[in-house]
Every structure is written in structure tokens, then in C-alpha cells.
């Protein structure tokens, strides 16, 4: 959860209330905001707050004060922003690196300069992903604008020369890394090129170079009254949302939309469209689990920054422009309950019968196996479910993540062994032998390409001369506790073991691997897994210098076999 630090004095002034710390904490908690700590910072009492990850509008005092004032006073405090179209135009040329832009203007602004800059930084860190997804530039419009259009374009760095923010002299584009502070170097790398940069230009003056820095030429100051805000990025929705947040939270006058002229289209930014949500009163009462009168529902929503209209049995709820966290009807139902107060919900039993919960049988069985493995000297691991595709060498068919955030998390694992190998790789300096195990789910695909979970038990043993015997003893001992007879068969001659044939060829040394079968007086001979000495190519891939013996067992299949006789 992102956090903010605000002055207690400023906070109380902004909500026009004299409240105790306990009263403030209770109000904040009702809105899903956690008071982390109350402390002094350079002689000033401050609140450190944890904000919900989807409430970017609350990451500054101004946004926080708006929701609390509305929560305390309802619709009487809501003021709709004055929005009009500006005569200012931005011409967007072909820009491939950060193709999406949105611009807007705050006229007659009266704002806290320190809060404004802090909020810009918070948006950069959160929704902006450290400026990789979104970067914000803010400018004093009166310092540079005289009627000509602003240009957004790509420029060769060797042709670039401008005076960056808070730097006394002009610098060349090729001097960015040497002349700018170290804290800006990470943003220079976001350009993706040592030869080209992106700029906003006005009348041959550079006003900003996103996502790195603005220019001294258009620097905003505490006395600035007309603020031009430009937002660039790789995702249009985020770019538009960030611009609206900056405009709405610090709007004390008029908001102006700016025309963006592209090669084949014209956009007006930001886009101030909101979706009205239509409910029946019965639908709302059914969802929340108790009866509420229409007027009460209306009041609850107005406390949460909605415009509400009731027509016959229908309720129409329109979120305010800054409620970007509203995605579906369920969010509005939640806001009704927040506005009503969870502490006010009646404690009646909503059902007429009672049930007894119990632990899932497979999980209970898994815990018993964990205890047995631990008593045999193995340390339990809990590794990541997502892997790099090259690490998941067990199968060619696997569930892939459609839009992975990183190459490290491209596919869902089909085996627990890669995770244990990665753990071994970074823990080779500990005392030998290193014995690790994991009991977790993997995700496999059936013949219809449908995914399903399987519970596996996997173990590895690494020491100077790992042998099959070490793993054999562990497996025999484990299944002896389950009253099952274990049999080991050479995989090469095991015609039934198609799944494991694919596995051993990639993981284990020939003639140092085996299939694992179990049976009992009322359980037929059943294949449950495999074991072997790990192939040196695997050691090389995961950079493990020690020999490894390993096993993998379909624990879910074992559970199905024995659950009827337990």
C-alpha cells in the first residue's frame, strides 16, 4: 500500500473540523485508510497514512480532504468543476517511444506548491511505475505561451540544447548523463536510445524532455496561477487518468481541455466521461443483505462522491470524475456500505441453517506429509508459481501469462523442481547435505488444452556425491508410514510411463533414474512419480556445482488412492 505523510495542522484546517486523533483515525478507517503512526517531524505533528493501492486520488492532502469533507457533510459540500475547451493546441508528430499524450490547464489556480510537487512524485512512483509508464510535466503557462501551438516530437540528441530545471546553464543532449544529477540517470535509460530524445517545444524553446526533466524556461513557482500540465506514457488510459487526477485535486478555478492534433486524428484531452450505473432498490438490498430506504441509499452514495437520481424504483449513480477506482457495480455496492458504516450493519443471521467448516482433506494430508519430510531432515521451501519459459523445461505445453510484466514470470510451473533448483543455486554455501522439499500445486494442460491444478511433492538432495540410494531411503520410509508398498522400475523399459519419459530425458542421467509405483492389498499397482540423479546440463543451467538427486511425486494421486482406507 502506498503511504503519505501529512501535517496534522494542515489536515484539520482542510476539513474545517476540530477532532481528536482517535476521531480522525476512526473516520479514516471507515474509508479504508489506515493510520500508520502519529509522530513529530522537525517539531510538526504529522500523520503517516497507508492508502489503498487503487485510490490514487487520495495520495495528497487535497484529495484526502475532498473525500473526508464529502463523507462528513454529504452532497452539500460537492462542487462540480468548471470545464471548458482551451484555445491552446498541441501538435503531435511521430513519436514511437512514448506515443500517448494528454494535456490540460488549471486557470486561476491557488495551490500549495509543496503538496503539488509531492503529489506529482507520488503518481510517478505508483501508477507511473517510476515514469516508465507515465511521466508528468508541469509548466507556468504565462511564462511561455503567446498563441502559437506546442509541438511534441522526437529530436536527435546531438541537436538538442536547453536549460534543464534548476540548472543555471544550457546543456547539450549528449551531456545529459554527465550534467544531470544521478537521481535522473535511471529516467534517461527509459528513452531506449543514446541518439534520440522526446521533447515538448514551443516557439523553438524546449519546455520539457519527458520522462526526464522540465526546462527552467517554463518552471512553475508558488505564485503561478495558470498551470499547463502535459502527461506522456505508454498506456493511454493511465496517461488520461493521471492528467485528470492532477487537474481535479488541485483545481480551484477553471479546468481547460487541450486539443491534441495528430497525423490522422484530433483528440480533446482529458476525457471527462463518466458511466452512469443503474440499479433497482431491490437489487441493492439483495446485494448488501439487508433493507435500506432509497433516500438512505442516496445519502450513502452522496457521502462517497456520487451524484444520485432516483426514478420510480430505479437508482442512477454517477461517480465523480476523480473516482477512477470505480470499475463495476460491485464497487458502488461497497461504497453504499462504507457510506452507511459497517458498524451500523445489523447483526442478524442471514441464513436459517448452520454449517460446520473443516480443513480440506487434501490440505490436511499434505500437512502430515510435510511433518514426515521435516522429521527426515528436509527443509521446506515455498517457491514462486511463475517461471521464465526456459526454466520450465519439464514440458513443451504449459499455461502462459498473456501480458507478463517481466521475462522472469512468463509461464505457470508444471513442476516444482525448477523452483528448488533456483533455491539450491543461491544456497550452495550452506552446510552439506542440502535437503529441500516442497508440497505445492502445479498447473498442467489436458488433451483439450484446459488447465487444471495438481498437488505435487518434490524433494532434492545435494552433496559432494549424491546417489539414488539417499532418495530411495526417503521414499521407502515415507510410504511405509502410509502402509503402501513401493516399487521402483527402470524408466527406459517402462512403457506405461509416457509422462515420466518426457521428464527423465530432460532432468535425469540415463540408468540413474526410476519410476515410482505403489500398491497395497486393496490398491492396484499405480504409477505416482519418478526419481533420479539430475543431469549435468541442468546443473549448468541453474549454476549448481554440487551433484543432485531428486524426486517428484503426484501427491494428489496418492491421496486419492489411500483416502478410502484411512
UniProtKB/Swiss-Prot annotation:
The keyword Magnesium applies. One of its GO terms (cellular component) is phenylalanine-tRNA ligase complex. It comes from the Eukaryota. InterPro entries: aa-tRNA-synth_II/BPL/LPL (IPR045864), B3/B4_tRNA-bd (IPR005146), DNA-bd_dom_put_sf (IPR009061), Phe-tRNA-ligase_IIc_bsu (IPR045060), Phe-tRNA-synth_IIc_bsu_arc_euk (IPR004531), Phe-tRNA_synthase-like_B3/B4 (IPR020825), PheRS_beta_core (IPR041616), PhetRS_B1 (IPR040659). SUPFAM superfamilies: Class II aaRS and biotin synthetases (SSF55681), Putative DNA-binding domain (SSF46955). It catalyses: tRNA(Phe) + L-phenylalanine + ATP = L-phenylalanyl-tRNA(Phe) + AMP + diphosphate + H(+). This is Probable phenylalanine--tRNA ligase beta subunit. It comes from Enterocytozoon bieneusi (strain H348).
